[in-house]
Design a protein with these regions (language model features):
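A catalytic-pocket lid/entrance helix-loop region that shapes and gates access to the active site
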Residues: 140-144, 241-340
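Alpha/beta-hydrolase active-site loop
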Residues: 166, 176, 193-211
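Alpha/beta-hydrolase fold nucleophile elbow
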Residues: 216-227
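Short alpha-helix in the alpha/beta-hydrolase fold that links the catalytic acid
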Residues: 475, 489-499
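Catalytic histidine-centered segment of alpha/beta-hydrolase-like enzymes
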Residues: 518-527
Length: 544
C-alpha cells in the first residue's frame, strides 16, 4: 500500500558484534542529558542484529540468516571529504542532517553472492515503512487477514509464507527515512529527506552502501517498489546507473504511479485535464462488477473490462474533449453508457458533467446503503462516517488491516528478530513508526534527467525510468496492477508504460500483469500466489 519499507542498524564489520552486546551495558543512564546523548549516538551509529530462521516455500526448505539494523545516510550534497571537524562542539551545535534508515535483510544460507539475486523492497506513502510488503507479501512469515472485510482484533495469526520469493532471491526490506526504527537527526532534518528527490537520493545511497557492506556488488540486483515506491524506483534506477555506475537486472513495479497528472484523486483541481477520468473508468467498472451494482452483470470480468477500455479511449474521450460544447444528445448517450459500466445514476453522471473523481465514486456506488468503498482496494466497504459528504472520510480497506500488520510486526521484530528493545534508546523502548506522516511536509519537486532546474507541481518520473532503460538496454521492467485499485488505477499504469519516451524496441523489455485484487495485490491470497510466480519467473529469466 503505501507504499515505503525496511528496518535498522549496522556497524562496521569489526564492531558489529560489539555493538549488539555492549549497547546494553551503556544503556540505563540516570541523567537525562546523558540519556539523550546516548540515544543520539545510538541513532547515528549503524546497528546490526543477526538471527537465524527457516521457511518452506513450495516444498523447498530454505534456511536463512536475518540481518536487522540501520545504515546511516547523509542528506544529498554531503561530501565525505568534510569528515573530521576541528571543533566537535561546533558540530554538536549544528550537526548536518542524517537519516538512520532501518532495514531487514534475509539471506539464504549457503548461497554464493554472484549467483544469488538480491531484491530491495519498499512501500511508498510517501513516508511509509515497508511493513506492508514485509508482513503481507514477501517476508518469510506473513500475517493472515480477512479477504475483503475487516480483520477481527487480536490475537492475530502469523504463518510461514509459502509465497515469499526467498526461493529465488535474497530480500532487503527498506523503511523510508523517518519510519520504522529509523530516525532523522540534525539541522533541517525533515527538509533534507522529505521530498521526491532527497528521498530517492537517500534510497540510492542506502542501496550502494548496502552492496558494499555486504559484498553484493556482483549479485543480480532488483528493485521492487509499491505505490509511491514505483515513483521512487524510477528515479533510483536512473541514479544508480548514472551516479553510482550500478546497472540493475530488473525493476518490479506494483500499483504504479509515475505521472501524477494521471491521478484520479485530486483531478478536480486541474479541470482542463480529462485523462485521469479515462484511465480510471475500467477500475470503476471492475468495482461495480464486484459489488453487483451494474444494470446487467457480465459473467466474465476480463471480457467486460476490454469493452470498457475501448469505450474509455473512444466515445468517452470524445465526449470529455467536447467540454461544455457537448450536445444534449451526446451527453445523454454517454451518461447512459457510463451508467451501464459504473452503476452510477444517469442524472448523477450528467450533473457531474460525466466526470467523477475516485473519492466521489467510492462515496456514491454504495451510498444508498450508507457504505463507502475502499480506495486502495474497492472490494472492501465500510459504514460511511458522514453519509452526506462528497468523498469518504476514511479508507475501509486500510482500516480493515492496519492493526493486524502493525501488531504482527511489532511482535515479530522484538521477539523473533530481537530488535527494538536496546537499552541505549529511551530505556529500552523504541517505537516502530509505520508512517512518517510526512505528506503535508513533502516537497513534490523533481528534477528530471537533463533538466536545467527542478519542476514544481506534480512529479512525472517517466523520463527517469526511460533514461535508466536507455543507459542499460538489458534492463527489464515488470508492472503489476490490481483491478480493484482506485488509488492507482490499473489502466493508468498500462498507459504510462505505453508512453515511456523510449525506442519502440525497448518496449519489449516490459511485461505487465493484472490481478483480481486491489492496491495491495497480496491482500488477496490467490493473487499473492500469482504474484510470487510472476516475480520468480521474472527474476529467473533476467539473470545468468
Amino acid at each position: 500500500m503505501r507504499s515505503g519499507i525496511l528496518i535498522r542498524s549496522f556497524l562496521a564489520v569489526s564492531l558489529l558484534a560489539a555493538t549488539c552486546l555492549t549497547a546494553h551495558a551503556e544503556a540505563p543512564v540516570s541523567d537525562n542529558v546523558k540519556q539523550a546523548e546516548t540515544a543520539s549516538q545510538f541513532l547515528t551509529t549503524p546497528q546490526k542484529v543477526v538471527s537465524d530462521g527457516a521457511v518452506t516455500i513450495r516444498g523447498q526448505h530454505i534456511p536463512y540468516q536475518a540481518v536487522t539494523g540501520t545504515l546511516i545516510v547523509h542528506a544529498r550534497g554531503w561530501d565525505d571529504s568534510d569528515i573530521g571537524p576541528s571543533d566537535p562542539k561546533a558540530e554538536k551545535k549544528n550537526p548536518d542532517a542524517v537519516a538512520s534508515i532501518f532495514y531487514v535483510a534475509y539471506f539464504k544460507k549457503g548461497a554464493h553472492a554472484e549467483n544469488r539475486p538480491i531484491t530491495f523492497v519498499y512501500n511508498g506513502g510517501p513516508g511509509s515503512s515497508s511493513v506492508w510488503m514485509h508482513m503481507g507479501a514477501f517476508g518469510p512469515h506473513r500475517i493472515v487477514t480477512a479477504d475483503d472485510s475487516h480483520t477481527a482484533a487480536a490475537p492475530y495469526k502469523l504463518i510461514d509464507n509459502n509465497d515469499s520469493p526467498l526461493d529465488a532471491t535474497d530480500l532487503v526490506f527498506i523503511d523510508a527515512p523517518g519510519t520504522g526504527f529509523g530516525r532523522l537527526v540534525g539541522k533541517d532534518k525533515e527538509k533534507a529527506f522529505y521530498g521526491t528527490d532527497p528521498d530517492a537520493a537517500a534510497f540510492t545511497d542506502f542501496i550502494a552502501q548496502f552492496l558494499t557492506r555486504f559484498g553484493r556488488y556482483n549479485s543480480p540486483k532488483y528493485l521492487f517498489g509499491e505505490s509511491y515506491g514505483t515513483t521512487r524506483s524510477a528515479i533510483v534506477a536512473n541514479q544508480l546507473a548514472s551516479e553510482k555506475g550500478i546497472d540493475l537486472n530488473g525493476v518490479m513495479l506494483l500499483s504504479q504511479i509515475l505521472d501524477y497528472d494521471n491521478s484520479i484523486d485530486n483531478v478536480k483541481s486541474n479541470p482542463s485535464v480529462d485523462q485521469p477520468y479515462v484511465l480510471a473508468l475500467p477500475s470503476f467498472a471492475a468495482t461495480a462488477w464486484y459489488h453487483h451494482k451494474l444494470p446487467a452483470q457480465p459473467k466474465d470480468l476480463k471480457t467486460f473490462l476490454s469493452e470498457v477500455e475501448h469505450f474509455a479511449l473512444t466515445d468517452y474521450t470524445s465526449a470529455l474533449q467536447d467540454g461544455t460544447a457537448i450536445s444534449d444528445e451526446k451527453l445523454e448517450q454517454t451518461a447512459q453508457k457510463l451508467h451501464q459500466y459504473t452503476g452510477l445514476p444517469v442524472e448523477y453522471l450528467k450533473k457531474a458533467d460525466l466526470r467523477v473523481s475516485g473519492g466521489e465514486f467510492a462515496k456514491t456506488l454504495l451510498g444508498d446503503d450508507g457504505m463507502d468503498t475502499g480506495r486502495l482496494d474497492s472490494r472492501f466497504s465500510g459504514p460511511a462516517i458522514d453519509p452526506l459528504a462528497q468523498t469518504p472520510d476514511y479508507d475501509p480497506q486500510f482500516a480493515a488491516m492496519q492493526s493486524a500488520y502493525v501488531s504482527a510486526f511489532n511482535d515479530y521484530a522484538r521477539n523473533t528478530l530481537h530488535y527494538g528493545t536496546n537499552p541505549a534508546f529511551n530505556d529500552g523502548y523504541e517505537e516502530y513508526k509505520v508512517s512518517a506522516h510526512s505528506i503535508g511536509k513533502w516537497a513534490f519537486v523533481h528534477k528530471q534527467p537533463g533538466a536545467g532546474r527542478p519542476a514544481k507541481g506534480a512529479p512525472n518520473v517517466l523520463p527517469d525510468l526511460a533514461s535508466a532503460m536507455k543507459q542499460n538496454p538489458s534492463l527489464k521492467i515488470m508492472l503489476n496492477q490490481g483491478y480493484y485499485d482506485l488509488g492507482t488505477p490499473f489502466f493508468e499504469g498500462i498507459y504510462e508504460m505505453q508512453h515511456l519516451p523510449i525506442p519502440r524496441k525497448l518496449a519489449s523489455n516490459i511485461e505487465i500483469h493484472q490481478y483480481e485484487s486491489g492496491h495491495m495485490v497480496y491482500a488477496h491470497a490467490p493473487a499473492l500466489t500469482e504474484l510470487h510466480d510472476n516475480v520468480v519467473n521474472f527474476i529467473n529469466k533476467t539473470h545468468g
